[in-house]
Amino acid sequence: MKHLEQRIHALLNADAAATLAGIRRGIEKESLRITTDGTLAQTPHPRALGSALTHPYITTDYSEALLEFITPPSTELHKPIEFLEQLHRYVYSHIGDEVLWVNSMPCMIGKDSDVPVAQYGSSNVGRMKTVYREGLGHRYGRKMQTIAGIHYNFSYPDAFWKLNQQLEGDNAPLQDYISRRYFDLTRNFQRYSWLLVYLFGASPALCASFLAGREHDLLERFDHSLYRPQATSLRMSDLGYQNNAQSSLAISYNNLDEYVSTLTHAINTPEPAYEKMGVKVTDADGNVKYQQLNANILQIENEYYSSIRPKRTIKPGERPTTALQERGVEYIEIRALDLNPFEPVGINQQEIRFLDLFATYCLLRESPQLEKCDLHASKENLRKVVYDGRNTDIQLYNWGKSVSLKNWASEKLTQMQPIAELFDRAHGGNNYAEALAHQQEKVDNPSATPSAQILEQLESRNQGFFQFAMEQALAHRDHFLSGQRCDATNQQLEALAADSLAEQAAGEAADQQSFEEYLADYFHD
């Protein structure tokens, strides 16, 4: 704690606020396309939206029906949400009577085969993306891949890092220092991510169709709905992921080299269950078809599920681990956020401000190496908050001591107050202090959390999860269709759609290698 106070005090004295104004933020938001009767859309990715392979802002995630909206990084606080708004308006003008689902847990889905895998064309890079997704479907089930979320991308400017490095008397090359400090942040994030799940978890219930035929310990209530009375984020649970080969993975976040080597080891280590499944199969017509990229524990880096990732922008054909190793950490991607169904774009400005505070708290707080016992405690804390978090008397593990969620959360938020002061100096006003106070209200009163508000609505209206989610989706559709579209943004998106289709076609025409050769080159060490 002393370490944290000293760092914040030094930053306040050094007038670090000006450097915080250079923070870059970006948002990735996933949404399922659904029909008006609430089932998953079976239509292909609309051509008017451009190529899902090459469009910078509108793409697909696992499924052809799982849209992903991406905002460019910006130093202006309001820009990501404004751009998301415009992307949604544009998409709604090109998807006919389809609707965007606004909950993290999916709509009514029957069989796994009802989930269409995303298609990216005939180029080698496009085929690789589709085969990777086929592999995920065989390994974990397609339904599991339809869960949607918000990813928050965040980076500090070099001026902030240089100031910190100077205050700490560190003489390492700047990029080495930056990478080391981002890993400090990621370790503390794993220790304290339970707090984000409590504050922003918005998936306490789900449609019973999602877990049909699978083991679970949820209660059935309302109309075809499964839930837990005190749950916060079933999206962040291990529901449906029984006997997952990833559960035994120990990816190290202690430093960049260990992270890259443990991740690379998992990508290069065969998994017997996946070997048995086979990489290529021959169909009845004698055609050879890939059903996964390889039979290793992880096909590629992205398969590793984590609530935070250290990232570096990759070059075409480059592996993420190579980019990290050669150029260091550039930004972090926070992946622990549910879609907020009460917000048209799934997130609001106040949440963004708190994420800034939370990430900076994780950076400035002392961050010892994560031992196995620490990882176990972090996972257990997360599990408790996922299933029973709104009982704020539940006991969590804090460095070997037992503490109630309520007391520990309040302590953390109090420790963030001087960080909020720093950010408010950077941006003027007291919006960060207000964002922090709003989170304290949720700790004092669990009924103010999004998860509680969802269950309260199901209870008071005697609705099932599906009816609630559909109502929200239709209300947000009306919001986007009735709002003002920005002509300049609209023209930009129309041009990008055309350019992306041309870029995909050019890539397909330029391919010289066979798919087998392409994969061999890609995975070549």
Curated annotation (Swiss-Prot):
- Which family does the record claim for this protein? Belongs to the glutamate--cysteine ligase type 1 family. Type 1 subfamily.
Lineage: superkingdom: Bacteria
What is this enzyme's class at the first EC digit?
Answer: ligase
Q: What is this protein called?
A: Glutamate--cysteine ligase
Family matches, as InterPro entries:
Gln_synth/guanido_kin_cat_dom (IPR014746), Glu_cys_ligase (IPR007370), Glut_cys_ligase (IPR006334)
Q: Which GO terms describe its cellular component?
A: cytosol
- EC numbers listed for it are 6.3.2.2
An example GO BP is: glutathione biosynthetic process
Pathway given for this chain reads: Sulfur metabolism; glutathione biosynthesis; glutathione from L-cysteine and L-glutamate: step 1/2
Q: What are the UniProt keywords, alphabetically?
A: ATP-binding, Glutathione biosynthesis, Ligase, Nucleotide-binding
Q: Which reaction does it catalyse?
A: L-cysteine + L-glutamate + ATP = gamma-L-glutamyl-L-cysteine + ADP + phosphate + H(+)
* Organism, scientific name: Alcanivorax borkumensis (strain ATCC 700651 / DSM 11573 / NCIMB 13689 / SK2)
